[in-house]
């Protein structure tokens, strides 16, 4: 006869195994281990923990026994801004997430979830929410800005009256429409005296919320600011590396969106691994050429904010830019694709900006120009791709130096590309 105590133990064991299987099925085995270790580190003891679980539990216990006393504001309630604010709150920082809509703020505070961008993921109960911009940024140590690129300048102007020593960190990837300004350029223009940095890397918000191990790069000329951001966000799940190459890190985060669109289009045509590898490596070459022209260190593109972010964005169907590209590849118009996505896809604007800049500077960027032809000149994607493959002979590893090859011939070649491979009545457009 089984005793009540043994029965309870068996039930607990069964429940634990069910939790384990559910977590690993949803998030992956490694993330499941990390999640269980976190619970252990927060007071739920487990007998015979694995070495990984023990290490993570110790890390989380240290964080909660010695919380970082930084005062932080995160502006922008999208997926990435919310995920970063949640990390900071979990690390013990005094963290406020500012969202423009008052009704959304009330809903987030009540449910502790971001139902629009991160449905189903509970946020740390220490995270505070506000729609009052002045109150959100006053007396803070660091202000993280995670609004879309189109709203970045306006947001800086709105917080300018309340800046009195706070540092600014941009989480926004992309370029300002019509000016080609990076977010760091806008910060220097609007708030010339402020201490600032930019953060970028292979950071899909949903994976971060699932506690899947991830990493990012904080770039700033200020070593104290780099260290402060590392202290605020670094954990067993999320590593923060430092760099002083602001331009390179920022360009990596902006340019990779172009090639995520290209990869999404390629996926729609069900290409093989050879094609994907070709796109990825030639994209890296284009990024580095362009970066050198803009004053970046080409080696930065071999790090997390370059090839790391490029790989993650080009490999994931979670990427907004990948999804835009996939819809384009299936015959949908750019306007219809953007409408269906319902979120900002920075790569669409970036393609236009980089195409114009590269054409003027004579930087060899055939993939970028091909995408411009498809999106802005209504060229047939398949026809442009075929002409791209027929382009002249090139060297392979040439991306560590700026390229002086003119794009005039390539541009002229694409303008003459036929449109007979494009369907006039695509079902996806209806």
Pin down the residues of each PLM region.
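Internal alpha-helical scaffold of NAD(P)-dependent oxidoreductase catalytic cores
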Residues: 49, 151, 162, 186, ...
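A short helix-to-beta-strand connector/capping loop
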Residues: 119-128, 192-194, 236-238, 363
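NAD(P)+-binding Rossmann beta1-loop-alpha1 motif at the extreme N-terminus of oxidoreductases
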Residues: 28-46, 51-121, 131
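General beta-strand structural signal in soluble alpha/beta enzymes
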Residues: 170, 195-200, 240-244, 303, ...
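Rossmann-like NAD(P)(H) cofactor-binding subdomain of soluble oxidoreductases
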Residues: 123, 129-138, 142-213, 229-231
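NAD(P)-dependent Rossmann-like dehydrogenase/reductase catalytic/cofactor-binding core
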Residues: 19, 25-47, 52-55, 256, ...
